[in-house]
């Protein structure tokens, strides 16, 4: 499974996004399932509605409902780790969506991610030491 950040969903949904074409090409070539978290879904819906309108938000929600990708369920015990991460990365600062993806990486045992957020996901470490591997924007 490949972890997906909000920025990937936004690139897919916005034809004028500079990463739109590369995100679509990557999506078309996938042989693995995608997985994200509820905080990422919430953030994506908010930003799609704000930037592109209700149709874009509803289209994304329809894909969630259709099972186009998996959704990791955060449990109460995960929030202790999320709070630790928010404290650790407070200078960025880190939001709930990004912290939830680190928890997901720790759960999966890998940091393979699709994101256009180069700054944050080049800094974040899962299990406090392992860097993320951004499959979308490999350099």
Task: Give residue spans per PLM region.
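Short, conserved active-site loops that position catalytic residues or coordinate cofactors/metal ions
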Residues: 37-43
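Acidic active-site catalytic centers that drive phospho-/nucleotidyl reactions
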Residues: 5, 43, 98, 117
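Active-site neighborhoods of divalent-metal-dependent phosphate/nucleic-acid chemistry enzymes
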Residues: 71-116
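Short, well-structured N-terminal submotif of metal-dependent ribonuclease cores
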Residues: 1-36, 49-61, 131, 136-139
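Acidic, PIN/NYN-like endoribonuclease modules and their adjacent C-terminal/linker elements
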Residues: 1, 108-139
């Amino acid at each position: 499974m490949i972890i997906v950040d909000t920025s990937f969903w936004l690139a897919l949904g916005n034809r004028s996004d500079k990463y739109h074409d590369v995100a679509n090409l990557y999506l078309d070539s996938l042989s693995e399932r995608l997985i994200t978290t509820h905080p990422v879904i919430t953030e994506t819906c908010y930003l799609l509605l704000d930037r592109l309108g209700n149709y874009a938000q509803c289209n994304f929600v329809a894909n969630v409902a259709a099972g186009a990708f998996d959704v990791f369920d955060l449990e109460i015990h995960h929030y202790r780790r999320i709070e630790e991460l928010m404290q650790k990365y407070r200078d960025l600062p880190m939001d709930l969506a990004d912290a939830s993806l680190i928890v997901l990486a720790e759960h999966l045992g890998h940091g393979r991610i699709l994101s256009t957020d180069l700054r944050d996901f080049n800094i974040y470490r899962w299990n406090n030491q392992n860097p993320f591997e951004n499959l979308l924007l490999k350099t």
